[in-house]
Each structure stands twice: as structure tokens, then as C-alpha cells.
Amino acid sequence: MAKNKGLGRGLSSLLGEEVISIESEIVQIINIDKIRPNENQPRKNFEYDKIKELADSILNNGLLQPIIVDNNFQIIAGERRWRACKLAKVLEIPVIIKNLDARESMEIALIENIQRTDLTVMEEARGFKYLIENFNYTAEKLAERLGKSRSHIANLLRLNNLPQSIQDKVNENILSMGQARCLINHEHAEVIADYIINNDLNVRQTEELVRQWYKNEYTKSPNNNNKIGKRFLKDNATDNDLELLVKALSEKFGIKITIENYPLGGKLIFHYKDLEELDLILLKLN
């Protein structure tokens, strides 16, 4: 029997058999309203222009490849085609029903979609995370199943640790994966991300910026003279009110007090010479 390459390697590897041609499968014509998308599929954004282009093709040529669904008519493979048929106002479409339980259906749908080359980096990263958390995969097993390197799996999994705002920027191709990786677990990731975007830094410049930030240094971007790093935040965020507050607190406690103010928080620092002076500070605080 001929192999159906159109379904990809995902179904065949997961079902433990070669995917056979659709001529030998049972193809049924189903009302499109009975079919529902898989809520756990990694792709969350579908470009309207591409769906419209596919819808126009379906109107002219019909749906050439059936959609794969489970017993509950939940889509395993073919959501783009289903959406295009909906847009084209097609009432009935050909489907192949796979006899799978809910767990098998969900797993195969995830794997099949992750293997697509047009997922965004974050969609792929979230898919990896979901498989590991819900299907007992390890990074090594996932790499083997998907035919990807362990380092690729590990690097994408770490992107899930980024603040949501940065994940969104990666998803929208405003930040690259290389730039985003530099910001993982950084206290001021969102501030730095905005600076990277506003100053059009490349990955190497981003790496240098983060390195210097941790060293409490500053540098200048190629296109302007603004200082960046911890000193940049402190120098630009400290205003007259904070200076007056520092002066008042220093006089009240009789010691040196400094305030480091950042866009995402700050530090109030009491400087003492010895434990006796520390005791006096604590006494006044109480």
C-alpha cells in the first residue's frame, strides 16, 4: 500500500504503523458544524490572509485532503483546512475518523502540530511544556519522538520562564529567540526588552548589554548616547522627591541612606558602621 506523505511522520510514529493512503481509509462526509478544534493545539494565531488564500483554493478545487478527527469529531490534524472551509461556507467536508481515546487524540494532535514548520517559537515552546507536564515526557524522550535535538528542546522550554509580555513579543517576531534567551530569569527583563526594541539591538549587542548590566556598568548604543544598565536606571529615575526623601531619612537616623529606584522596584539602603549603630537603627524603626 502506498504511503500518504501528506499526513507527515507524526501520526505514523505515534500510532506505531505506517500511515496508509487515504484511498484505503474510510472517508466520511460530515457536517462541518459537528467538527470542533482541539483546544490544546499549540497554534493559537491563524493568519487571516493565509486562511483566505486556502479558502479560495478550496472553493476552486475542493478540499483535496480529508481532515483527521477522533470519535468525538475533535480535530487531530487539519485545523487550518477546517477554518478555511468555514470561511468558504462549505457545509460538509470529508473526514477520516481515528478510533482513539481522548488522551491519545490530544497527544497525537499536539505532536502533529508541533512538527509543523510554521509554528512560532513560543507556540512550539508551549507545546513542549504541555507534553512534558501532561504526558510524562522527558526532554530526551520528546527530542527522540520529534526528531529534534535535546538542546533545541531545552532552549525552547526555557522560554516559558520569560514574563508573558516578552513571550508575546517573541510570538509577534518583535524579539528573536536569541535575544529573548538572554533575558531569561533577569530581574529587569521587561525594561531591557524595551531598550533592545527601541534601539534595534542585535543578538550580540543584547548579550553584551546583559553582561554589562550584571557588572553594574553602562555602555552606549550605536545610534544614541543614552546610558544603559543599572546606573542608567538609577541616574534617570531618581528625581527631586527621592533626593529630598534621602536627605530627610539620613537626618532622622543620623546615618547615610541611599535609594536605588528602578522602573520595576528599587532598594532602600541603610549604611551602618558597626552592630551598635545597627541596633540604634532597629530601635528607631520600632
Curated annotation (Swiss-Prot):
Superkingdom as given in the UniProt entry: Bacteria
Molecular functions (GO terms): DNA binding
Family stated for the protein in its record: Belongs to the ParB family.
Transmembrane feature ranges: none
Any GO BP: positive regulation of sporulation resulting in formation of a cellular spore
Biological function: Involved in chromosome partition. Localize to both poles of the predivisional cell following completion of DNA replication. Binds to the DNA origin of replication.
GO CC aspect terms: chromosome
Entry-linked InterPro entries: Chromosome_partition/occlusion, HTH_ParB/Spo0J, ParB/RepB/Spo0J, ParB/Sulfiredoxin_dom, ParB/Sulfiredoxin_sf, ParB_dimer_C
Assigned keywords, A-Z: Chromosome partition, DNA-binding
Any Pfam family: ParB_dimer
Classification via SMART domains: ParB
Species assigned in the record: Rickettsia conorii (strain ATCC VR-613 / Malish 7)
Keyword DNA-binding: yes
Protein name per the record: Probable chromosome-partitioning protein ParB
Gene: parB
SUPFAM superfamilies on file: KorB DNA-binding domain-like (SSF109709), ParB/Sulfiredoxin (SSF110849)
